Amino acid sequence: MNKSYIIGASGLIGGSLYELLKSKSLDVYGTYSKNNEDNLIFFDMNKSDFSCFNKVEENDIFYILSAYSNPSWIAQNKALAEELNYKSTIKFIDFLNVKKAKIIFMSSVEVFDGSKGNYSEDDKPNPLNFYGQTELINEKIANIYQKILI
């Protein structure tokens, strides 16, 4: 059976997904970087130390939900936000691609300008803030990988 990993399981959405998959009796693991919770694995994506995932097997599933997501904080801390939300995420996706893992990258509605609502993959992105810009960059780069869903 393939394992599932929730990167950012200590966050609101990641935590909900982690609990849902656990309730289905799936082989699921979650990570945290700041908000330590029981049964989660410490993982700081900014450090680019992916050794805790060396035993990942082909077709294991990774849900990437780890990001700085407060637009006003990000506007004041662009370099740090860029490091996690873009550079470190892409390095991690590269690592997982070599392992032939399946990747589900959770983006954000912030890649759109909010003028329409109920967006689909066919809508034209138009981010209005730096957070949305970093998420859009990740989406564009992630599209080159074969085993990734956005």
Please place each PLM-identified region on the residue numbering.
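Active-site YXXXK catalytic motif of short-chain dehydrogenase/reductase
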Residues: 85, 131, 135
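Rossmann-fold cofactor-recognition segment
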Residues: 33-50
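Short, polar loop motifs at secondary-structure junctions
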Residues: 9, 28-37, 133
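NAD(P)H-binding glycine-rich loop region in Rossmannoid oxidoreductase-like domains
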Residues: 45-84
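Conserved beta-loop-beta element that borders a ligand/cofactor-binding pocket
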Residues: 102-104, 108-110, 139-150
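Hydrophobic positions on the long internal alpha-helix
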Residues: 88, 92-96, 142
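Active-site "gating" loop of Rossmann-like NAD(P)-dependent oxidoreductase/epimerase domains
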Residues: 68-72, 76-80, 108-129
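N-terminal Rossmann NAD(P)H-binding glycine-rich loop of SDR-like oxidoreductase domains
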Residues: 3-24
